[in-house]
Curated annotation (Swiss-Prot):
Position of the signal peptide: 1-20
Pfam families found in the cross-reference section: Spore_GerAC, Spore_GerAC_N
Record-given protein name: Spore germination protein XC
Gene Ontology CC annotation, any one: plasma membrane
Lipid attachment residues per UniProt (N-palmitoyl cysteine): C21
Biological source species: Bacillus anthracis
NCBIfam families in UniProt: spore_ger_x_C (TIGR02887)
Length: 317
């Protein structure tokens, strides 16, 4: 019995050596950045961290009752990106976490005039950044992009800025870009990186009779040899989807003499590229084959004629 008591006292002494979770923080006491906007103006880097309310994402057993909670947008400014981050800290009321950033949005002004090497250094050295973040560009003020809401008071987390792959599965209008792809292409001399550009629009949605702002993809910005080259608009990128092996589903309007005759859904492009040098210049020939479904034809048409019309339409793209 004495041995058991001595053993118990011996074990009790070790309890005082155990560490506790004294530095643990409750989730509501930490500010989690959802999207990070980066701009460049008057030789200063400006960051715009976007914060969202996670309570609108909670699962409810009864009828959904989502209370409207707009995104909160911070701002920091400095000669360097790190300096801008510490400038933002001055007004932060709680600890800020950079570990769960879903996407980065940079302005065209930053791509043209900012230091892209500094951006890569900023994202590489800070251990909380993840390489799986989505990368976007924009020509619009970042406040407009980051403040755009979602329908039914659904969290801003569920937008194309954070989940672009959801809409791409239904209609492949753009090829979303991950940070690890951007960084790997950035150091390749022969690679051109296409950054999808975001814009706001009121053309497609209304809340009752009131125009409702939503995000959309509208063009690409191109980077080559570590410098911003130019942007490509809707008409310029019309054929890009057919050169992307990840295109799962994309529509094509069939036309004959500028008259719409049908709608096809094309998918799973197979691309065979051949490169040759002629008179000292490279020539590239691409043979593309796709699977497709005919969704609508305005009048009966043989399959071989549909294929012929399709080939003509694709070449024009």
């Amino acid at each position: 019995m004495k041995i058991n008591r001595k053993g118990g006292l011996f074990l009790l002494m070790f309890l005082f050596l155990l560490t506790g979770c004294w530095d643990r923080r409750e989730l509501e006491h930490v500010l989690f950045i959802n999207t990070l906007g980066i701009d460049f103006k008057d030789n200063h880097y400006i960051i715009y961290p976007q914060f969202i309310n996670f309570t609108n994402m909670a699962k409810q057993e009864g009828p959904a009752n989502r209370n409207y909670s707009p995104a909160y947008i911070g701002k920091g400014e400095g000669k360097l990106l790190y300096d801008a981050a510490f400038d933002f800290y001055k007004s932060s009321q709680q600890k800020v976490s950079w570990e769960h950033i879903k996407s980065i949005v940079v302005t065209e002004r930053f791509l043209k005039n900012g230091n892209l090497n500094q951006l890569n250094d900023f994202l590489s050295r800070f251990f909380q950044f993840r390489n799986t973040m989505w990368v976007f560009g924009t020509k619009e003020p970042l406040e407009n992009i980051l403040a755009t809401n979602n329908i039914f008071n659904i969290s801003s987390l569920y937008t194309i800025m954070n989940l672009p792959q959801e809409t791409i599965r239904q209609s492949a209008s753009v090829d979303p870009l991950r940070l690890y792809t951007f960084r790997s292409n950035y150091y390749e001399p022969g690679m051109t990186t296409r950054i999808p550009f975001l814009a706001t629009t009121t053309e497609h949605w209304k809340q009752g009779h009131k125009a409702f702002w939503m995000l959309e993809f509208n063009e690409y910005g191109c980077i080559a040899a570590k410098s911003y080259v130019n942007h490509l608009n809707d008409s310029d990128i019309a054929g890009v989807r057919w050169t992307n092996k990840n295109t799962n589903r994309a529509p094509l309007l069939l036309k004959v003499k500028n008259r719409a005759i049908g709608e096809l859904i094309l998918k799973k492009p197979k691309i065979d590229t051949k490169v040759s040098i002629e008179k000292g210049k490279p020539h590239i020939v691409m043979n593309i084959s796709l699977e497709g479904d005919i969704y609508q034809l305005m009048k009966p048409m043989p399959v071989h004629k549909v294929k012929k019309t399709l080939r003509i339409s694709l070449k024009k793209k």
